[in-house]
Amino acid sequence: MARSTLTFEELLHLQLAKLDEAAEEWDLQVRRLDDMKDLADAMGEHARTATWTGENAGLTLPYVTEQVEQFDAARRQAATLRNLLRDGHGRLKYAQDRLKTLVESDAPRAGVHVSASGEVSSDLDGLDGDTRRARQDAVVEIAGRITEILGVLAQDDAEIAAALRSAMGTDPDRFSPVDYTSVQQARLAREDADRVLDMMARGNDLSDDELHDLALFLDLHRDDPAFAERVALGLGPQGVVDFWSGIAGGRDFREGTPAWDSAAALQAALGDVLGTATRSDSDAMERWEQDMTALGDDRVGGPGGPHGFLAMSALLRTGDYDPDFLVDYGDALLSFEQDYDGRPSMLWDSDPRLRMNFLGEGAQEGDRGRDPVIGLMEALGRTPEAATRFFAPPDGFSPSDGYPAPPQVFDPGADNEQVNERLRYLASEREWWLSTGHMAPDPIPVHDSFADALFAAATGNPSGVFTADTVEERLADGDMRTADTTRVMDQVMHLYGTLEPNLLEETPAMGAALGAMAGLYMDDINFWISDDSEAARRLNEDLFGSPDGERAGNGHTNTIRFLGALGRDETAHGMVSQAEQIYTLGVLSASPPTDESQFLRGMESISTAAEVRGIVDQARVETINTRYMDDEGERIRQLGQSSGWWKAGGAALLGAGAAGLSLAAFPGGAAIAVPLAAGASPPLIGELMNQFVDDVSVSSPDTAQVEMTESQFFTAGKRDVADLEQIYVDAAINTGLDLDTEVRLPVQVEGAGYRHGRDLYEEVGR
């Protein structure tokens, strides 16, 4: 039994008012932090969307972001300290009340006296035998009850102290985002952490049922930073890779069995817990992260065993990991792989019996987790901050002094064509493969996880966030693009459009991701396509506004090339076509044709939309004609299929956020978010887009296979833009604008714009 730090006399006369006052002070602090939350969030948003230049670009934003995160941690820690103090006060008050009742009431009633120091006695003089024995029994009982009260107090006192230590965290300079509601909860978390460590020390000796229990314990506390750090530090980096390698490779799990499910749950829960632990900035966890990275190239269990990278990357498939750790770990992993004199599959997939992964459809399809880069890419896809830093442009990829300034524009003609080494290696040079059963590695052009990581890096959004179920919540977060994500997008456009224009055709799995990226940068794409003249584009700066002046800087020609590359891919072609349609509707809704000036602005956006559509349509037609040169039937089937992007089913517009994004669904589960022009009306856009879908559905029956000639395909593309123009012209007429006498502008600009777009592709887009 724990020894109490409080004596009988101290407990009896303990002044608890100060403890109660401390709890109320923490409660007041919580309420103050709640009142300041909106200001803190606004500060973070302003910092994120501001255009930073000079040294501030790399210093201010990370600093402010960190302070906002610390603000949230401070609020959670303050609430936890309040809760623990309240609970602790209640426990001490209960012990004191029990003791007072015993001393002041129960003992005197039994003829027993308790001294100021807690000594129990009774006056036995002159008592008969039975009364004397009763008094002696009462002395023993009262003394025992005092001992029991002090014993419980000792336990409570130790638990309160331990809970407060857990709440304080391990870093004296940072707040700890713990979230305990009681002393008991903190004690259970600490006990569970110790129980988990005891179980994991047994490694592969654990039964299947024990693996299930271990996964439950970890999952229960996956978001508890104190629990997570206790487990991570207790295991140590070597213990982590030894444990998972032993579990994953030490027994034969069969898919569909409870044992397999337990292994998958354990992998996910352990990854979640380790991710939470890395979010701590304590010295101990920073050393842990460094040591884990350093042992990645070591063999687990000696020569012939799997590398540490394989075990840790399997655990990266779930969890919210610290961006610094992911960047350092990723650099070490790829450096080790690239230094290897041979194919990556020979380095990682040397043992066909090895399994490291049990998660997701990939495991069911045969992804045994023998490619550690996949786990890294999945983690980067969930962590945009890390992905953006991982794919940041090198020093040689410097902006030129061209227009606009600021921000500066990347000049693809300058002597700085080298993009991020990791980006180019993973996109076009690396050998990707799947581990399928006990067979040899199955080569693939590129893995989906790389597309997810690149999407996160270039847009600031975690992969997979734009779905029908999450759209409203995600769009409420606003436009996540920053100067840093835009510089990644510069490289993506340059790599896929200019440096390696056939790369997307060679890696079609990238089509949906690149189409989604283009959708989020549709404002910049329209700006650069609008004119090849710098002076003319200046007039379109407001029409195709970019958040806080930050703009992708690939210029007119490079943007045409990028669109051409996307147009050659069926999925990307459809996504760009749909994104352009919605984006232009947004621009039109923000430019109601109330006068000649407004009408001309709207017609300029329609003309640009026609050019964009002409570029991607021309690219798609030429690709289909080349690929199916000797099969006319397949050519017309492919053309009809590529023209049916509008078949997103019912309403194409799923939702819109107040921060200026709209989202459209796309067949196959992909989705695109599109920036809205300032002043755009999301409800109106949705209404018009749905009307467009209904109109096209009526004119083009949804048959199992639509066939279309090249001429019909181009006519359909031009008609889509003509629908935009007709909507706008009708709106102008309804406002009373005399198009013949006041504007003197011939309608049907979409025809000239569409033809010009096709010409642009033929001139520079191939």
Residue ranges: model-predicted function:
Residues 168, 172-181, 680, 688:
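Mature, well-folded catalytic/scaffold domains that follow N-terminal targeting or propeptide regions
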Residues 7, 15-20, 589, 662-667, ...:
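Compositionally biased amphipathic helical and low-complexity segments enriched in hydrophobic
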Residues 651, 682-698, 703:
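Amphipathic interfacial alpha-helices that partition to lipid-water interfaces
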Residues 1, 54, 653-677:
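Short hydrophobic membrane-inserting alpha-helices and related fusion/pore-forming segments
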Residues 668, 741, 748-765:
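Membrane-insertive, amphipathic helical modules of secreted toxins and fusogens
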